[in-house]
Structure formats: structure tokens, C-alpha cells
């Protein structure tokens, strides 16, 4: 059996795995236990009442968090003409068509998000085996294939998070950094839950948001009492 580190022992002693914490108490606990030598992210796991084996119950989308994620995001855009100028003006680091595709084929992928206008998908489609496994393939379901590339760039820069349930019906994403004010983390979490509720599949029955847990990059999960969140997020 692996030996517990001092940090792991502290977390084990502080976090009650059987308890649902009020959101304010949970955030204070996460901040107390975030002792890594870097600013840890605050991540959320949301257990959904869906059958992930059925394609019509899968949940996928994107939403802009009111206070962003605390990450600087580099954006690449496949488009041309006036859209290319608009993308650059909106802050995209890389804009192009075949030239950008050639960079990616060479392994030059210094970006976090890829956006494409519909007319560029003939070029982007060639990159599926490279971009797909890295989660960088543009998709209309999360707003990264769109005629309005400038708005998509602004959303990405403003702290948009993309979400997709895993095979167990759980959504994993980030809602900010541990040095965010508690109110900002709470509001970001509520915004995500509102977006997930709007994305509820009509075929999903029973309780939809079954469990919400927060953790930091290096910390343990803390279950959240949802009654302490805004009415819209419940």
C-alpha cells in the first residue's frame, strides 16, 4: 500500500467524504488546502442523471463563465476574407486556411482553441486525426464552427468553458483559479449549472443534476450542498 504523503494526510483529515458542504464552506476549505507551489485551478465534477450509452442523452456544449477561468487562451481560426480580419481584430493569435493547416501538420500547435467558419471546414476536415485526439476539432455544438468567428474568439478569450459528459455521465470542467474571490467561484459554478440544465436531454428521466463536487488541481473532491446555490442553478 502506498504511503500517504503529509499533504494527503492533511486532506484526508480535513475533508469529510460523507458530507455535503455549503458552497461557501467548501470554497474556504479548498483554499485552505491548496498548498501547491502554483495557483491551482478549481475543477468541478457534475454527475448527471443520464444514460451515457445512449447518444440522445449525451450532454455537450459551451458557456461563458461570468468571471472567466483565469487562464489566458490562445486561439487559432480557420477562415478567410473579411472574417479573417474580424478574427484578428477580436484577438485571435493565428488566422489562416491552408497555411494554418500546414503548420498543424508539422506539429506546430501553439494554441488552446480552434474556431472555423463553415466554409473552412473543407480544410479543417483534413486535420481530424491530428486535432481530434487533442480535443481541438471545431464543432458547431460548442460554437467553434460558426459564421461569426469574431464572437467565438471573444467568447474563448472571455473564459468560455466547453463541457461533455464522459462514459459515466459525468461532466468535468474548470470554474476558475483558487485565488478567485469566493463569490466569483460561486457565480461561475452557478452559471455552469444553469447551462447544464438548459442542455438537459428530453429523454433524461428522474433527478438530472445528481451530485456536484469541487476540487483543486492537487486536492480531493468536496461534495456541494446544492440548496445553497441560486434558485436558477438548482
UniProtKB/Swiss-Prot annotation:
It comes from the Bacteria. GO terms for biological process: regulation of translation; translation. Keywords: Repressor, Ribonucleoprotein, Ribosomal protein, RNA-binding, rRNA-binding, Translation regulation, tRNA-binding. GO terms for molecular function: rRNA binding; structural constituent of ribosome; tRNA binding. InterPro entries: Ribosom_uL1_bac-type, Ribosomal_uL1, Ribosomal_uL1-like, Ribosomal_uL1/biogenesis, Ribosomal_uL1_3-a/b-sand, Ribosomal_uL1_CS. Gene3D superfamilies: 3.30.190.20, 3.40.50.790. Coiled coil: none annotated. One of its GO terms (cellular component) is cytosolic large ribosomal subunit. Belongs to the universal ribosomal protein uL1 family. Part of the 50S ribosomal subunit. Binds directly to 23S rRNA. The L1 stalk is quite mobile in the ribosome, and is involved in E site tRNA release. This is Large ribosomal subunit protein uL1. It comes from Serratia marcescens.
Amino acid at each position: 500500500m502506498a504511503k500517504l504523503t503529509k499533504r494527503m494526510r492533511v486532506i484526508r483529515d480535513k475533508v469529510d467524504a460523507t458530507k455535503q458542504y455549503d458552497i461557501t464552506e467548501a470554497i474556504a476549505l479548498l483554499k485552505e488546502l491548496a498548498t501547491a507551489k502554483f495557483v491551482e485551478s478549481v475543477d468541478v465534477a457534475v454527475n448527471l442523471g443520464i444514460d451515457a450509452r445512449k447518444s440522445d442523452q449525451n450532454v455537450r456544449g459551451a458557456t461563458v463563465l461570468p468571471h472567466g477561468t483565469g487562464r489566458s487562451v490562445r486561439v487559432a481560426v480557420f477562415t478567410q476574407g473579411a472574417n479573417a480580419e474580424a478574427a484578428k481584430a477580436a484577438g485571435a493569435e493565428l488566422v489562416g486556411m491552408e497555411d494554418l493547416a500546414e503548420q498543424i501538420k508539422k506539429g506546430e500547435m501553439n494554441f488552446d482553441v480552434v474556431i472555423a467558419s463553415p466554409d473552412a471546414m473543407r480544410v479543417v476536415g483534413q486535420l481530424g486525426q491530428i486535432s481530434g485526439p487533442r480535443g481541438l476539432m471545431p464543432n458547431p455544438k460548442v460554437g467553434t464552427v460558426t459564421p461569426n468567428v469574431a464572437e467565438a474568439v471573444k467568447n474563448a478569450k472571455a473564459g468560455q468553458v466547453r463541457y461533455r459528459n464522459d462514459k459515466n455521465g459525468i461532466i468535468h470542467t474548470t470554474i476558475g483559479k483558487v485565488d478567485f474571490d469566493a463569490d466569483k467561484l460561486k457565480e461561475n459554478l452557478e452559471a455552469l449549472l444553469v447551462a447544464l440544465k438548459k442542455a438537459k436531454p428530453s429523454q433524461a428521466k428522474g433527478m438530472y443534476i445528481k451530485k456536484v463536487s469541487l476540487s483543486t488541481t492537487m486536492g480531493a473532491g468536496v461534495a456541494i450542498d446544492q440548496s445553497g446555490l441560486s434558485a436558477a442553478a438548482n
